[in-house]
Each structure stands twice: as C-alpha cells, then as structure tokens.
C-alpha cells in the first residue's frame, strides 16, 4: 500500500471517529452509558472476531488475554468518561477535549521517563491549556462537570495508548490483543450495566442506528482499517490526520445537532487544535533538517 492511500484510509477512520461523538449522543437518548458501552464493544468484538476467527484461535494465549483484559478495562474507563461527559457538554467540546490525549501522552512519558519535555511540547501544552480555559470556563459556573469527565477520558486514553505500546511489543500478534480488548471492554460494560443500570436494547430506530454505527463502523471497521493503514505511513502524518477528529466532531455537531460555539469557544478550540498539532509536528524533520541530539523526550 502506498503512503498516500494509507493516509486517505486514516482520513476515513478520522471521519468515523469524529462522527462517534454524535452517535454516542444519540445512543444516550435510548440507553444508559454503561449499557451503550456494552452494546458497542460487544457487537464490535463479535464482528471483528468473526473476521479474524482463525487468527484468534492460533495466537490467543494467557499473556494476550492478560494484556487485553487490562487494556479493555482502561478502554471501558475512557468511554465511560466520555459518555458521562456527553450528558453535560456538547459533542464539539467533547471532541476538542478528547484531542488532549495527543498532549497527555508525551507529558506522561516525560514525567514517568524522567526526561525533559521538548520546547514545542511545552508550548503546545500551554496553548492547549489556554484553549481549554476559553472553551470550557463559564462566567457564572466555571468549568462544567461534563467537560471534566471528557478531560479525564483524554487522560485515561493517553494511559491506554502508552500501555498498548508496551503490550504489542511483547506480543507476536498485536491484532489479537486489539480484538480481545474490545470483548473485555464490552464485558466490563455489561457488568457495570447489571450493577448500576437496567440492561435493555434500544427502543427506537435512531438508537439502533447509533449502536450499529458505533460498533460496526466506528469500532470494528475503524480499528481494522487503522491497523492496516498505519504501518504504511509515518507516526507524524497519522497523528496530524487524527488531530482533525475534533474538527469532524464539531462539523457533525453543527450539521445534525445544531450545536454552535461562541467566538470565545471557537478561539479556544483553535488553540487546542494548534497546541495538539504543534506537539505532534516536527518542523525540522518535515523540512529535511538535521537536529542536534538533545536530552529531551520525543514529543
């Protein structure tokens, strides 16, 4: 596969994931948060498991299941946070706040790796934090609870990405870990549904559309396409394309939910997006210049 085709596929995946905030919002009108997670990841696991049944049988072992269980639990935490956040904030805000994952990953790497962050990472964090303030702070009530849930979701997703990176290095088949984690996320969602909610199926057409879109398109198909395409492009190019996810979320929110932001909100969203891009973008590398080695974390 040529890099251009791989980048086009990643753009399609970004469209899928950007639309997921809209579908989660619609799904929450029919079922409760944990119930929606159980349906989404349970169906996604079944779909991906059917497609790769032989591979799962050959390569599944105790180590794969241990890593998948941990990653699945964290993935459940990520989407539980997003679901709870969407009950108190807009799809646009949720999308931009979740993009902070791109910044949290190198920040956590610098903290736990005890290395100095790069200057562009520091600047990116400052810009993003300023953007968060403009995007979420309200004159009367301050930052909303829904926004805080989404920020927690971004932080958990950063932890998930870091642990995934470690897990796949120890596994002969990362795809197996990825598929099994969908099943574990769905199982945790079902357990929490039984404990805290009432298990049920969507009672409307829009509810079923949301569940099927989330499970089959955003999760199963999106996951498979990402796995196929990302090995044929660079991490920087993929990261920059994925950074457009909140823009897609905002467009879907505007078109289908009539969500709009104030001028302050648009400025804040722009700063978040620019901060995220700055954290991902290595200008010197793109320009073909050689950088002198420095004692810094890769950001």
Question: Where do the PLM segments sit?
Answer:
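Specific transmembrane alpha-helical segments of multi-pass solute transporters/efflux pumps
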Residues: 16, 20-21, 49-98, 134, ...
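Membrane-interface helix-cap regions at the ends of transmembrane helices
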Residues: 23-26, 30, 44-61, 127-143, ...
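C-terminal transmembrane-helix exit sites in multi-pass transporters
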Residues: 47-58, 82, 101-123, 247-267
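Transmembrane alpha-helical segments that form core, pore/gating elements
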Residues: 45-48, 105-106, 111, 142-197, ...
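Glycine-/small-residue-enriched transmembrane alpha-helix faces in small-molecule transporters
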Residues: 1-35, 81, 141-166, 188, ...
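Hydrophobic transmembrane alpha-helices of multi-pass small-molecule transport proteins
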Residues: 48, 69, 75, 100, ...
């Amino acid at each position: 596969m040529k890099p251009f085709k791989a980048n086009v596929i990643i753009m399609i995946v970004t469209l899928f994931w950007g639309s997921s905030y809209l579908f989660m919002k619609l799904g929450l009108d029919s079922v409760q948060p944990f119930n929606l997670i159980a349906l989404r990841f349970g169906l996604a696991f079944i779909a991906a498991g059917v497609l790769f049944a032989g591979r799962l049988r050959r390569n599944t072992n105790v180590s794969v299941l241990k890593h998948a269980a941990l990653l699945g639990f964290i993935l459940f935490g990520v989407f539980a946070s997003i679901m709870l956040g969407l009950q108190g904030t807009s799809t646009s805000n949720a999308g931009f706040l979740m993009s902070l994952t791109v910044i949290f990953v190198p920040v956590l790497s610098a903290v736990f790796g005890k290395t100095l962050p790069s200057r562009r990472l520091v600047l990116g964090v400052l810009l993003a934090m300023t953007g968060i303030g403009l995007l979420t702070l309200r004159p009367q009530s301050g930052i909303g609870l829904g926004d805080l849930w989404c920020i927690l979701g971004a932080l958990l997703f950063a932890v998930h990405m870091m642990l995934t990176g470690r897990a796949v290095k120890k596994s002969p088949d990362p795809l197996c870990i990825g598929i099994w984690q969908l099943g574990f996320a769905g199982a945790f969602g079902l357990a929490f549904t039984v404990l805290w909610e009432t298990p049920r199926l969507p009672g409307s057409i829009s509810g079923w559309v949301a569940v099927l879109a989330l499970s089959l398109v955003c999760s199963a198909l999106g996951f498979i396409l990402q796995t196929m395409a990302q090995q044929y492009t660079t991490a920087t190019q993929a990261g920059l394309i994925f950074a457009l996810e909140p823009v897609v979320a905002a467009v879907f929110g505007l078109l289908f939910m009539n969500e709009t932001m104030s001028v302050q909100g648009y400025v804040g969203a722009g700063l978040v997006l620019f901060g995220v891009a700055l954290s991902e973008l290595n200008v010197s590398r793109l320009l073909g210049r050689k950088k002198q080695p420095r004692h810094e974390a890769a950001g």
